[in-house]
Structures are given as structure tokens and as C-alpha cells.
Amino acid sequence: MANIAHLIVSGLLAATVAHGQQYEGSSRSEDAFSYVQPRNTTILGQYGHSPAVLPSPNSTGSGGWQAAHTKARHFVSQLTLEEKADMVTGQPGPCVGNIVAIPRLGFNGLCLQDGPLAIRVADYASVFSAGVTAASTWDRDVLYERAFAMGQEFRAKGAHIALGPVAGPLGRSAYGGRNWEGFAADPYLTGVAMELSVKGYHDAGVQATPKHFIGNEQETQRNPIYNPNGTITDVLQEAVSSNIDDRTMHELYLWPFANAAHAKAAAFMCSYQRLNGSYACQNSKALNGLLKEELGFQGYVMSDWGGTHSGVASIESGLDMNMPGGLGPYGTIPQAGSFYGGNVTQGVKNGTIDEARVDDMIIRIMTPYYWLGQDKDFPSVDPSSADLNTFSPRSTWLRQFNLTGERNRDVRGDHAKIIRRQAAEATVLLKNEKNALPLKSPKSLAIFGNDAGEPTMGAVNQANFEFGTLAAGGGSGTGRFTYVVSPLEAIQSRAKQANTLVQYWMNNTDIATTDVTTLWVPAPPDACLVFLKTWAEEGEDREYLHVDYDGNDVVSSVASKCNNTIVVTHSSGINELPFADHPNVTAILAAHYPGQESGNSIVDVLYGDVNPSGRLPYTIARNGSEYNAPPTTEVTTTGAEDWQAWFNEKLEIDYRYFDAHNISVLYEFGFGLSYTTFNLSEINAEPLVESISSVPEQRPIQPGGNPALWENVYNVSVVVTNTGDVEGKAVPQLYVTFPDSTPAGTPPKQLRGFDKVALKPGQSQAASFQLMRRDLSYWDVVSQQWLIPEGEFVISVGFSSRDLREVVRVTPVSGST
């Protein structure tokens, strides 16, 4: 979804943006770009194949929702046809998405609010760390706690439905503009984060909405280009089509959404782009086939804002709720009509739409509402949200909303402490030489970089401003800050305790072109801290991977004169780091988007109050041109169907690609340093079942799919020891190498487990990893099921994807089985 400012720009300049981006420093030939149709698609299955799956399956309330399902059916039985149409059609109102109330039934409506790191359209609310930051903790407790705390704030502001968490984009491309909203460029780590986030939201009494389903891996041309001289639905060029083969769909992009379904997610949001030629929000193979049938999803599917492109076809294909309800770009013109709304009423009356299908749409919407107890004592919508909602200001409302509750509620509680602690734990220490960190009572510090200080445009909303620290990205996934603690503010506060001299310069242009020895007085500082940033936002993909505002030149200028240069990046994700090997750059920390406690969290790490335990949720290549799978950013023809993104890299994204092609990297997936050291020993794999067959037992589908896939079949344990001098947290990671009998195209190794273990110096503790059947299975495109291949699996445990220290081999299925 887009905020209103970006909506206007996108609507007017879509063609310019779509054709204007190039990749800096790239020497790729045309054949390397993803819009070229691959010549050989036989290995992993057919491309562009989305067979119709009709009708849309009815919900059953399975997975423990039966009582709520019964209440939902009773509710639907009392509705008029017009009320049924209202229940599946959004209306402009106080929240970014609204379902109107039905007072005669005691139903107060539904409030849907962004987003994945905060309740965006609200004041006096916290702004948490971004998804990529949370994933960098590799900590299950953090992932759950973050979602639970956010859910508390959503509920206190009267929001029934949180529009998050994010598994799409997964991170296919390093340039993805919204990668920071998601978690990791890996389906397993993202899947764990999705499952725990859904549980956290739900335990707080708020509906989770995993998004964007599915194949939403670029921003460029995510929506069609409309004819400015035509009707409101007259399209010049369709949205880009993500063309994904069957095996890749299951093993990469569907995998984390399966975790979300397994956690009994209330809703799913379908994505803007086309999938194998059909818009994702009317792709019956994806919505009916994959989600509702294969994964047994019992909740409802809502469109992304303006992602609905038809009425009857979308309803039949599995779209249950049209948001925000109107026509036009991003669905923001309700006065022009709706694909749903009155057309639902008319379609039922003339027999075009089966009323039983409409009933199931509403049952799916109301079942999680009752399951979470939102029909009892749920807070009213904070009236101030209506004043802040530029997406649907009051002048656009077609219905009246009863906003009588407390205004300007402060819902933050003690969440600042949580945000600070989590952001510190997420910080990834990439380099630390000459014992540069932690800082040891420095007498003098020099601070450089336009990311160090206060946001000069105010802290309320993040934007790509030149001066001021960057704590979140842009678009609907951002937050409305009450305050941001800048690095400079936090360092100055800490420095006062030790009478440390702090000097600072925040004009990158001046720093990059000045002899910095002329800046510091009276002597060289003990350490030079350089703060760099990289902006990313919804609606556009990144054009380059280096840091913004001449950041590399800033580092070069400082490091040429300061032999203890410490670099901190606040970034959406992947950056080229050409200064990593500079001898005077003694330390590098990746802090990503840390949220409102940005400065405090980095100071905790710099001074050693927190031992960094963050690990990379992606790979940092030596050169940006080495990444595969760039987004499609240029189409030279004007045909309606010309925007195609061929996912011909198949399963080879991020570390899987670099491993498959034996490419050296700067910092590998899962990498991160500590102020202490760790070791592993005594690996062991214990089978948890007497025998394992290649084919899973066929059981009634539950949320998440066949329950047999979620059963643990092995327990792998390893002893972790702190071999250093200070307390710290180790992150042992388990990777699986599949047997040679697995079909071609299988990555050399895949993450299938991780743990986080706090250890005092000299302490040892066992870490354990539960391997499920699905962890040892591949998707067979012929039999259309998950199979465990015959032969020997290699299970490796280490501290990153390329630091594997303990190995054990298991053979779940032998050739004679």
C-alpha cells in the first residue's frame, strides 16, 4: 500500500519511473536481466502456468476455529444482501481500511491499519525496528515479543487488523525497495519470523495479515499504467508479471507463508503484481489452490490497496475483501464505484455471483474476529487517527463513523525499553580489528556523517532527507515517530559521564572534500565514528547498492587521516562496502533501521553495555554486480503485456546462488562478530520416529497444510562454548545438504535451524534443533507433493553459512525403503 504523497507521484509519473532506472556499475549483458524469457525451463517445471482452481473452497473452522466459525455463520444468517456487500467492501474512513458497522447486530465495524513496524496512522505510538532489523537478531523471543508489543498498541488504538507481517518481498533481488519490511533473503528464517509474528499479534488480540501474497519481489511496475485520456480502468500497460515455476514457488516463496498459515493467520493480503500472467488478487491457482486448499487457510484474503482488477473473477478466484473499496489508482476514488460493493448485490440478484460464495467470504472475515474475542470490550478507534489519515481524509467519507472514544491515547507503555534492547541485539558487527570496540573511556571522539544528527525535517515521518539519522524506511510500512534518539544525542549523553570531548561534522559534501585534520581540535581523536545511511521505500526499487550522499567518499576522507575509523550503517539492507578492507577502518556495524531508540541502541553496543549478537539475514557481495536476479526496471516496448520478470534463477537467491557458483563474498549470510569467541562440539542427530517414508502420510488438511509435514523427525544437538573473556550470545546455525538423488537445481545447502544461546566466559550449553519432515523434503512437480529423497543428508552446524564446524550425516530414506 502507498501513502498519499507517494500515490500522487506514482500515479502521475508511473511511466517515467518505470523506464528511468539503471544499475550503476553493472556490466550485465541483456541476457542476464530477468525480463528475458529463459530458454530452458524443464528442470524445475513449467513457467507461466496458473491453471484455474474453482470454485473457491468453503471454510470449515478447522484448526480450533470451530466455535468462532459457528458464531460467524450465525452472524451471516442475519445479514441483508446489502449488508453482505458492505462486509466485503472497504469504505473510506478513520483507518487506512474500514468495514462499516452494523449497529442492529452489535457489530462496530473493522479498523485496518498499517503496518509492519508500527501503527502508522496514529499519534503517541511507538516505532519499532524494521523487519530486516528484527531478523538480524536471529532470536525467536525477540521476534515474538516485538509483534506482541506492536499488537498491544494496535489494539489500544482501536485497530482490529494489523497489516503485517511481511514475507513478500522475500528478498529475491538486492535492489528490492521493500526488502526492509520483510525479514530475510531465506525462506526458513523468514518463515520462523512470520510464524512468531503472527502468534505475537494474535496473543495481543489483533488480527495479523501476512503480506504480500505472492511473488511480490519488485516495486517497479507493480501496478498497471492507466491511460490518462481513457476511463478509470483503461490500462496502457499491465503490471509486471512474476513468472515462477512450481518448485521454486513451493520451496522459496510459499514456504514462509505456509508458516503464517500454520500459525492460523487471520488474513492474507494478496499482492499488486501479476503472477504467471494473472493478477495476484484474482489468481485462483494462488488463492484457491495454494492458499485455501493446499495450506488449509481458514481466514480471509484481502486485496492490497487498489489491487483488485475485477469483480466476479476476483470473487470466484478467492478474494474475500476488496480494499480500500473504490476504483482508480490505489482504490482511492470510491465515488467512481467499486468492483465489489453494489456489484456484489447486483451479481447475486442476477445470478452472476453465487450468494453462498459471498456468505463464505463473510464467514472467513468474521471467524477470526470471534476467535480473538474482538466482539467483546474491544477499544474504539482513536478519533485522532481520522485526523492523521491522509489516505482517506474526512472529505472522502461516504458513510458516518461513530468516533466517540478517547482522543490522542498514549499507547506506548514501556515499549521504548524493548525497542532499545532489540535494536542493540540486532546490530551486526562486521569488522572489529585492533580491539577498536568496545570503546574504552575515550578522551576524544569525532563524529562524522549526515546520519548522525537529528532529522532536520522533524521526526514525525521518515523521508529521504539529507540531514538526520535514518530509523525507518518509507511508504506504508513506516511509522509516525513521536521522537527519534539520534546517534549524536546518545553519544553526547554518554560522553558526559566520562568528560569525553565530542566534536562533530554532518555535511557529507564538506567532509568528503576537506582535510579532516583541519576540523578536529586540539589533537587527533581516539576514535572517529562515521554514520552512513541508505534510503529505501515503497513504490520504487533501489538504483544502486552503495550508501547514500557520497558516503563512501566520506569514509575515505576520514579514514585517510584517522587510524581508528568506526563505520555505522543505517540501511534498508544490502550495501556495497568498498572500504571494508581499508586498514584504518577498524570496525563496521550494520544497524539497519532500528526504530525510535536508534542512538541509544548503537551506543549500548559501542560502549560494550551490549555484546553484539546480530547476524546477517542476507549476503554482502564484494561487488554489487555479482548479485543475480535484478528487478525488471526497463522495457523498451509499449505492449500491454511486455512487463515480465522471469524468475529463471529458480532456487538460487542470495547465499544459495553464491554457494552454487562458488563465488567469494565479503560477508556471508549468517555472519556476525562478537566481543567474545565461541566454539562448537559434540554434534549428534537423534531420530524421533522409528521409520520414515519418502511420501508423507496423507492426513486431513489443517492450517499450514498436511500435518505430517510439521512433525519433528530428528533432533540435532550440539554443545556451544564461550571461549572468550566476556559474556555473549552465540547463534549456532544448522544447514542441510540434500542427497544427490534430489532433482537438479537443489542448492548446495539450506538453512533449517538456528538457536541463540547466552553464555558466560567458559560456560558450555547444548543447543538443539528440531528438524521437521518439511525441512528434509523437496517439492516434486510430477507427484505434486513433498518428498524426502533417498540417500544421505549432510547436516552441518556452524556460526554462518560459510563457517560450518560440526557435521553429522543421516539417511532418513534408504534406497531399499
UniProtKB/Swiss-Prot annotation:
Subcellular localization is given as: Secreted
**Entry-linked SUPFAM superfamilies:** (Trans)glycosidases, Beta-D-glucan exohydrolase, C-terminal domain
Q: Which residues form the signal peptide?
A: 1-20
Q: Record keywords: Repeat included?
A: no
GO CC, one annotated term: extracellular region
Instruction: Give the chief site where it resides.
Output: secreted
State the disulfide connectivity: none
- Database matches in Pfam families: Fn3-like, Glyco_hydro_3, Glyco_hydro_3_C
Q: Which GO terms describe its biological process?
A: cellulose catabolic process
InterPro entries of this UniProt entry?
Cellulose_deg_GH3, Fn3-like, Glyco_hydro_3_C, Glyco_hydro_3_C_sf, Glyco_hydro_3_N, Glyco_hydro_3_N_sf, Glycoside_hydrolase_SF, Ig-like_fold
Name the UniProt key words of this record, in alphabetical order. Carbohydrate metabolism, Cellulose degradation, Glycoprotein, Glycosidase, Hydrolase, Polysaccharide degradation, Secreted, Signal
**Stored Gene3D superfamilies:** Glycoside hydrolase family 3 C-terminal domain, Glycoside hydrolase, family 3, N-terminal domain, Immunoglobulins
Q: Which residues are annotated as active site?
A: D304
- Please describe what this protein does: Beta-glucosidases are one of a number of cellulolytic enzymes involved in the degradation of cellulosic biomass. Catalyzes the last step releasing glucose from the inhibitory cellobiose.
Q: What is this protein called?
A: Probable beta-glucosidase G
